[in-house]
Amino acid sequence: MFYLDSRHVYRVTELDSIEWLEHGFGTRLSDIPARFPRLATLKQVHSAACVAAEGRAGALGTGDALLENTPGAVVAVKTADCIPILLVDQRTRAVAAVHAGWRGTVARIALAAVEAMRDRFGSAPADLHAAIGPGIGKCCYEVGPEVAQRFGEWGRAHIDLAEANRLQLSAAGVTAGRIHASNLCTMCRPEEFHSFRRDREAAGRLYAFAGIR
């Protein structure tokens, strides 16, 4: 279950019991870079590329998922309608932050991130928690036929990006009870979230972060 904390960050109740974990999904009112000055990010390119942060901070090149298992390190992705996903392996103390827009979803970035966690850290998909944060909802995400057809059976006039990524995570082996979805639409809630579709070039960015204390 998602809830808003005193720092205006959405957290996941089921992840709060993991004592070494830093995690959250920022809002318009939260300043994540100020809180974590050694934050690692990527130039996001709507791909299925996964990058290992290895304790580094700052901008670490191009890609759409950042992996980390270094104590004291925090990784993040930036969104403004795209779906942010956090992966957490309590057993191996490893995390990933994933950026899934429609192109990344079609490229199966969620699946690629689960496989990268397995290959780099030995994470079993069934051990992972996956938190799907605020993004544009099916209610607001109307697309043209050229986009809809890329989603196969999910290719309707309104695309449910969060559900498409939930299905990818499930197909990758993440168990249903460990997939936590916010069901919060960024376009519907201007008081809380930035939205590129709503605000265009004036839109800011929301940070979704995960790290190891």
Model-derived segments and spans:
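Active-site microenvironment for binding and transforming phosphate-containing groups
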Residues: 1-213
